[in-house]
Amino acid sequence: MDSTNLYSIDSVSALLFPVFKRYNVRKAILFGSIAKGTANASSDLDVLVDSNLRGMRFVGLLEDLQEAVHMDVDLLDVTRIQKGSPVAAEIQKTGVVIYEE
């Protein structure tokens, strides 16, 4: 990504769209510092996905997302989020849908 759009939700969404489509992700939500507009050079990309991916297919999605944006991605599956947890609260507060079938 060029540095002027490094942390733009629109630019991140555009880069990740083909990856989500290729892996048949049902929905993806961006949350955390990039979604809040407070990201810096050391920020990672926080993404929650709703998918049927498990095991190596999930790892493949993670690797392809990181390659697409050239930054670390913290990838979570919706089935792993506990209701009422701090992560669930962060997603509820800052989450932005960036992909949906």
Regions found by a protein language model. Give the residues of each.
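Catalytic core of pol beta-like nucleotidyltransferases
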Residues: M1-K27, K36-A41, N52-E101
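Acidic Asp/Glu-based divalent-cation binding sites
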Residues: D44-D46
